[in-house]
Amino acid sequence: MKFLLVAINAKYIHSNLGIYSLKAYAEKELRKKKKAALAGTGKLLSGVAEAGVQGAEWASDGAVVTETQSVAGMSSGQVQVEIAEYTINHQMDQILQDIYRRKPDVIGFSCYIWNIQYIRPFLKDIPKVLPDVKIWMGGPEVYYRAESFLKEEPTVTGVMVGEGEATLAELAEVYGEAEDIDIRLEQVRGIVFRKTSGGILHTPVRPLLPMDEIPFSYNNLEGMEHRIIYYESSRGCPYSCSYCLSSIDKTVRFRSLDLVMKELDYFLERKVPQVKFVD
């Protein structure tokens, strides 16, 4: 199961902090699920040994798997999250070809004022070449009008509303299991999605994450040598500018100062030429 997070930036030197943050958090949660599943397998092995269970099957790596064992937790390790960044100066055919080559099962588009009109044609073209792909949208250009956007774009499966880190991690788990997807999507907070029956469902608002729970987005700087790195030490805004979406929610959260200093040191040690705060 492959998730492809797509950003279409205004310039090559720009990067999309949002999708890097989503990827980092999703991978952290998937590792936790896999670790918990492996721990559960260890307990199962211990129980099998103590009880002398007959008829157990041995997997290729030597682990015992019984017919009744649930492998739900193990499948999280099979979910792959990739990032694809393009610019509005790319030819649309180039982008479509690259997305097709990556063969994603689920695509997530990061939508802003500078790319939403550029993205819309892909919502019609991608299903023509990848008919089974699920398309999800996120970002300020879609989540405040999620239901109307779904009505305008019938190929889109759903919209992530608000901050997407925890939401994407849960979506990855749902699609990784590939069972009772509609029922399980109803349990994912912070989405508006199109049910298989055609109806549109809003799930409850997702609580905001503490900033320190969001992992550092740049543990790998490969490919970032000539690009601007964006960094946030806080989210939210206390002001009420009428033209700005940030004024809708006046909640302000901060990353701990020690963590901010540690992460900025990481950039300095690697001689990153430019870091921009997006607070």
Language-model features: locations:
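A short, sequence-level motif marking secondary-structure junctions
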Residues: G52, V205-M211
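Radical SAM [4Fe-4S] cluster-binding motif and immediate context
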Residues: S60, D212-D279
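Nucleotide-activated donor-dependent transferases that construct or modify glycoconjugates
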Residues: K2-K11
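A short, Lys/Arg-enriched amphipathic alpha-helix followed by its capping loop at the start of a domain
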Residues: Y25-K35
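Glycine-rich beta-alpha loop elements in corrinoid/cobalamin-binding modules
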Residues: G18, Y25-E27, K43, G47, ...
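Short, glycine/serine-rich, charged loops/turns that create anion-binding
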Residues: A10, V142, I248
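Short N-terminal binding/cap micro-motifs at the start of the first secondary-structure element
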Residues: Y12-I19
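Generic structural signal for well-ordered alpha-helices
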Residues: K23, R120-L123, I229, L264
